[in-house]
Amino acid sequence: MVKQTISAFILEKMYRNRVIGGRHISLEDLRTGCPSHERGNIERTLKKLVKENLIVQHPTSYGMQYALNPQRIDEIMKILNIR
């Protein structure tokens, strides 16, 4: 996968599962469905998306969780070519 494809994979998976705002997903669950040789790139790309504020972090007692930023959902939909 190319970096852009990994970003699209993460955003699409989270959008498809409606992981927006208060609903969140762990890094381990995000990695499922991705080829094993690309799983290291998922974490690096996820950190990049957090810095771009497309994804927000939710610290929990059982680890860091991630969700799509509801304030930037229109931009995310443009990236995914939805609508």
Question: What does each model-found stretch correspond to?
Answer:
Residues 71-83:
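Short, amphipathic alpha-helical interaction segments positioned at domain boundaries
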Residues 62-68:
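Minor-groove-contacting beta-hairpin "wing" of winged helix-turn-helix DNA-binding domains
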Residues 16, 20, 33-36, 55:
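General structural signal for alpha-helix termini and helix-helix connectors
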Residues 27-39:
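Short helix-coil junctions and helix-kink-helix linkers
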Residues 50-60:
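A short, conserved structural fragment
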Residues 43-47:
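Short, hydrophobic-biased segments on the C-terminal half of alpha helices
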Residues 34, 68-70:
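Short beta-strand-to-loop capping motifs
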Residues 1-20, 80-83:
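Short alpha-helical segments that sit at the start of domains
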